[in-house]
Amino acid sequence: METIVNNQNNGQQNTVPTQSFSSSVYMNYDFFDSQQLQQPQHQPQHYQQQDSFVSPNLDNNNPQIHVQSNNYNQNGFVGYNNSNNNNNNNQHMNNQYSNSFHNNNSSGFMAFQNNSSNFNNQNNNNSNNNNNNNNINSYDYNNSNNNNYNNNNNTHSNNSNNNNNNNNSNYWNNNNNNNNNNNNNNNNNNNNNNNNNNNNNSNNNNNNNNNNNHHHHHHQQQSQPTSPYNNPIQHNPNDMKFNGQHNPFNGNQMVMDNNNNNNNNNNSNVFNSNSNSNVFNSNSGSFLQINNNNGSFSSYNNNNNNNNNNNSNSNNNNNNNNNNNNNNNNNNNNNNNNNNNNNSNNNNNNQFSQSYDSTLGNNRFSSMMGQPIQQQQSPPQQQQQQSFIQSSPQAIPASNCNGNGSTSSSTSPLSPTLIGSAPGTPTSMLATTLFGFNLSSSPTSSPSSPVKKGKSQSALALSSSGGSGGSSGRKKPQKHDSMSSITNTNLKSTQASTLKESKRSNSSPNLKKQMQLQQLQQQQKLNENGTLIPPLPFASISENITNNNNNNNNNNNNNNNNNNNNNITNNPLSGSMEFPNSNNINQSSDSINGEFNIGQPESPKMYNSSPSPPPNATSTTKGGKKSKKSLHISTTQQSPSLNGSTGGSMLTPTMSGLSLSGGGSGGGFSPLISPTGTTSNKDLQSSPSPSPLLKSMSMGKLDLQDSIDSMSSPLSPNSSLSSSNGLLPPPPNSNNMNSSGGIPTPSTPTSPPPLTHHINIFSNLEFVKQLKDHLLPNDFKPEEHALERNLLRFQQFVKTLAEPLQRDVVTSMFELSVDAQLQYGSNLDNDNLSALMLFRRKILNFNLFRMMMLNDPNSFIPLPSPFPIQTTTISSNGTIVNPTNVNNNNINNNNNNNNNNNNNNNNNNNNNNNNNNNNTTTTTTTTTSANTVQSGTTSNSNLVFQQTSNSNTLSPSQQQQQQTQQQQSINGSSTGSLSDAQYQDLGIHLDTSSANSGCGINVSIGSSIGGGGGGSSLNGSNLNGSSSISGSISGGSSNGGGQFIMSPQFSLDGAYQQQQPSSYNINNEMELAEKDEDEIFNNNNKDNNNNNNNNNNNNNNNNNNNNNNNNNNNNNNSSSINSNINNVNNCNINNNSNSNNGSINSPRPSTPTTLNSSGKRSKKIYRGDSFGAGNDISTGLMASSDQIIPPPQQQQHQQLVNNNNNNMNNSENNILLADSNKGLSVSLGSLPTNTPSSMEIEQQQQQQQQQQQQQQQQHLNQQQILHQQLHHHLSSSLGGAQFTNIQQQQQQQSGNIFYNSPYNSSQVYMNPYGTSITNTSLAGPSTTSSAMQHMITNMTSSNIIVNNQNNNNNDQNNNNNNNNNNNSTTNSNVNNNNNTTNTPSSPPQPNNCTPTQTSIITSNGVVVPSLQMRGTITNPPPVLPTPDTLVLQQQQQQQQQQQQQQQQQQQQQQQQQQQQQQETPHTPTSNSISSPRSSPVHQQSPSNTNTTTTSTTTIRHSAVTQLSFAGLHNQQVSPISPRSPRSPHGTSGDYNDGSQSPSSRRKNRFTDFQIKRMNDCFENLDKNNNGKFTSEEICQIATELGLTDQQVRVFFQNKRARSRPSPRGQPTNPLTSSTNNGNNSNLALQHLQQQHLQQVQQQQQQLLQLQQQQQQQQQQLHQQSANTTPQLNSMNPNSINYNNNNNNNNNNNNNNNNNNNNNNNNNNNNNNIINNNITTINE
């Protein structure tokens, strides 16, 4: 397991960057060995790929990390995420983290079995410590830190403590510092650093540097960490016993530390976010890796980076992380402090990337990983880092192209898998990560431009290509030649400097050898595993994650510098990322090179046609000497010729749309797109015209070779693609694809022919057709589809191929990615990045990917429609249940907001922080901790598709790129039933071993910018993310888990609705129709909230970043609510909210409604309802007020919330939920190209800071009140958990629910929505109250959007009045959502909604029915009640009254009929039996519908009984009162059983219907001359009529006895009495029967008419309230959350940190976390 210690900024001042570590965890315990733990301290960064990770035996008295790598090796990370979620619920990150470990332990994934308990204990301790800290208000910060240290002598505990502290905001900073220290194994130092960092960044940096450089060395306290009150924390050296054995955890190896950091972030919502987003990042970024746990860890690293970014560590953290990575904390800190500037930020980013690279060093797919980049360092640091680079298997960091002139390597563990292609480039992702094996040789190695000296440099840049160092005679690569060169090159910097460093530096021979050896080891490992394609993440995913990480770093840097968005852009475009071990590949196998006809000549001319200046060359410093070596591309390394004579790629230039070198004529690839269309090759001049799609995209002219003929030409004799060779799979059918999730595996020939350079895989038209059929839907729209889904299918398809073809495909994809990289780099202009630029690049990249599958790339490319992917919920038993596609609509827009919050904390950093927040949020979302929830609730294994949208921080192009990535993010879950291996291949972890996790499917694909778990790039338009739809539903950072985050372009059902659904602004509040408890709403709205929950984590991070804000928050959170606050923060209750800490602030005073003891609401919960402090929440359900708040102006309100500090046009940028038959679909609105200028941001920040200072005193006062209330409530519980309400003496009443077990080692904040139910303690889970158990078992809708309210509370506390107002409105929306979520019963459904019954299988096997509402979602009204809603209520009440009146009338009519029958001269035979068991079969339920229910049987009936049954079903009888008047003369008269005298015999009462049926049966029996009914017939009749066999038998006996006097052959009228004989009586009775039937028919018609009228009325009402009552496709209440509220929460946090805009973002983060928690409960 590798850990990257990422510094998280606890910066108390924006100007003062502080170090905090948000550790990104690559739980790659597979690669840890006990030897690694025992490595000397001077070699903490030296990694060896190991199969197992064994921690040294540590003294339990001195808590230390006990790791058993074996556990982690499996799905430990996923389980880890799950655990994180639980822990988040129990306690923030720590609890989640511990839970993650705990789950892992239960799953056997977790290396920390001892620590899992310890970790849980630690988490509990952390929680307790946090609680103590909170209670102590950071007095016990030292204690908590000590506890954390003690716990974390597993760095994790420290992290959790840090997170708790982060939650405290004061503690956040301190704790984050501690976490960082723990990560560095210098907890004290980190504390000092954080405290100092907040105060003195340089000192912190130094400490961090020391820690980073001497992670293992600095276990001892170099400086005493100070509490928030600057009280030195006294640590017992024994308590903080971090031995060299722990060194692996520290430094790059500190995977656990990173995780802890992430946990901290998540704990403070960041860690959960991180863990969630990490999980998702790993899933999204390294889906396959997650399966391997390597990817998961890589994802963690990315997430961790994001977490750091999110933690407002984003700025400082990025710096710190970078510092840790670079071991140049001082410089980084200085850069951060000074730079929140582009250079320092870029450096930090590079460093940050480096830290990822180092973490990846232990990954099994280290070749796919990037090594840390060295910056200018002291010789000892350089030597240490160099040693690490040499030892680590990773060789590929990707450097981001920062406009600041500094390059930041954005390679995340996932991103290294990307081959120097733009993060959005799908092909590069496919080339590197799509397939599990590394190419022994790459067709081309894109020259990654190294950063200038002092900048981070990619490890691959260090490694040279096969050629010798001589660069003479070689033409320097041009600007457009490689994305990496552009990304690494500061476009603003002079071209002279660019030309001066255009050559790539060659790494030392030892490094090359080591890399080659590592590659061989990797390959060997893969071979041993029996798979050539290990489940690595898709490059796109990994890139997105990497980009997100980079973005986080960039965002952090941008936050620091504002980074000109160049960092962000560079990160998403991290074209500098080279193909993993490209040098190794180039040199690894000559035989393979020969196969592919790929060579590495000394000095080939590259891109000789490129007019742009060459990229900067990478230079590495070793031993004080600088060796420069340019990348050499072999002249033999050419794209396959068109005629097929030469080629190493399945792609022809035409197919790929690339302008490849002329057939064997030499020369490298030409730029993919040339604005001027000039090329040096004559062949290119005659290339066909670009495709119409490219023309429409204004992408420029493609230089294509005329290779159309070659594509259709037959295969050469040497071709390995003959139809009979078995290499191609049989044409799959839709059934196979749907059922197996992939194409059937073809039979592999026993001896496949060797792959030759003549092969052109696409020359086989059959194969091309198959690719088209599987990968090219007919109706594709780039803005409405996620590319990753095609990539996933493509991966599945390729995996069915034989190895030669697989390698061929990989080679071709690599070529495509390299060319695409050049294209990206060619048109890059950091100064003029348009919003459409990145979007077009993404589209171009995808189109190129598809063009390779076309016979004629110039032909019109049909836009494929997204193939429906049915989202599935996988229960704990592994069964796949079709879940409501609820969570899918969650978009990572809020994540962007989270990043914004972090950025705000650091500096003005509004944009940068936003990016960071996005990363953090993404991370939170990624964690599917819901699966680990130990409650009885089922955890929906929802795929989280987080889409990070960096709004302000990102340039418009970056925002668009994020949106594109989000759109491309995988939306659905796996289709059909897949095997475990297949799920793992998809990056889906089925944590069936965990008690609760129905499915630990973490599938979020982070957008490249959003970073960490899908990033929040989706809604980049709004800084606040308020308009953005939180992409992460997955249990918000702390609680979230297992949430679906759906790409906005996809409907919840996974199918795209062709109709443009009516747009709905997620940010706008949605008014939900009243829902009964049984109804489960779609998670779509809630998903936004989940994103907001992620933002909550960011808020915690924000607290850490901005000490001032944190202090304010701490004052609010820590002093009064400290313990609760931590829990609250974990629950996504806003830490930042002043005195609202952990409490839910309602936008307005509300009349609370209480919940009855059964947990059902006595009153409806409406949109806009707020949860008052006095609400009865003992059942775990949030009460809501009866009052409906009239909606304010939705657009205006949202815009106010979003625009508080967002300079984005929210109305334009709002993500719209569209109505579709399949469910809600989310579409992105246009993104504004404008970003606020730095001056505007500074002004806003100044204004916000002033406002914050004014609010601080109020917050303190509120905290005191809350603190008293908390002690009162917390002291009230003994042993068991209790819910307590916290009343805030504030304009807004907020109710906090704390699930406290004072005797447990950890206090668990129980999300009122039941986000986390298990309470971990040393002794084990604490008992839960009956109300809690009820909520756990019954509340599928447990996900209440109280989080949004929390966000609102935070907003009010932190944000300006305007923002607060907006936030309040948003909160109301959240409340509505919460109400909707809470309601377990199904309310009357709108007429236009078609309810579909689905079932959710809980972890205990109970099937819970859930309704899916399918209808249109219209723009929800704002919070305030509207006359329409009031009218709707009144109308509904009137309808109910009318129904009651109708029922009464029906009863009266029935009574009248009975009286008429009684008055008739002829009475029916008084032998009708009526038993107490009699149940009216067709009796209508008096309350609800007027439809009658019939009980049918499937038993075959005899001819005798079939008539009666036919009459029963064909004839609808009006409902009859169960008890008609007893009259010996009535139709339902009493029948004597004949056993007793008339006076004493018991009377059985039959209904008229029963009597009539039995008489009919008796008459039919007589007609058929049957002597008696058989026992079977009697049983059938009794079953039909709801009677017992005895009753029916006695009835017939009595009937037979009375009918004996009449001739046997003469049928007796069943209704005639034995005393009344004669035709007259029979005729009279028949007449009465006819009248009765007529009356019944009339009544039925009346009922139908009434029903129709009611339906019409409902439709009218629904139309009237169409704007106010959105109808969610799926009723999973968890998912229903509103991003608006979350945005508001983020705003509050940002206000605490910087400006209101940032606060809004922070608030959004808080909401996301809560949503995640909610999702976790539901799941």
Curated annotation (Swiss-Prot):
What keywords are assigned to this protein? Coiled coil, Developmental protein, DNA-binding, Homeobox, Nucleus, Transcription, Transcription regulation
Where it mainly occurs, coarsely classed, is: nucleus
Record localization: Nucleus
Q: Does the keyword Transcription apply?
A: yes
The residue ranges flagged as biased composition, category Pro residues, are 746-755
Location of region: Disordered: 36-425, 440-522, 543-756, 878-978, 1080-1214, 1226-1264, 1345-1399, 1456-1498, 1513-1547, 1598-1625, 1661-1723
Q: Which InterPro entries match?
A: EF_hand_dom, HD, Homeodomain-like_sf
- Compositional bias of kind Gly residues: 660-669
Keyword DNA-binding tagged = yes
**One GO biological process from the UniProt record?**
box C/D snoRNP assembly
Q: Name one GO molecular function term.
A: DNA binding
Source superkingdom: Eukaryota
UniProt GO cellular component terms: cytoplasm; nucleus
What is the protein's known function?
Answer: Putative transcription factor.
Please give the name of this protein: Homeobox protein 5
Which taxonomic lineage is given here? Eukaryota, Amoebozoa, Evosea, Eumycetozoa, Dictyostelia
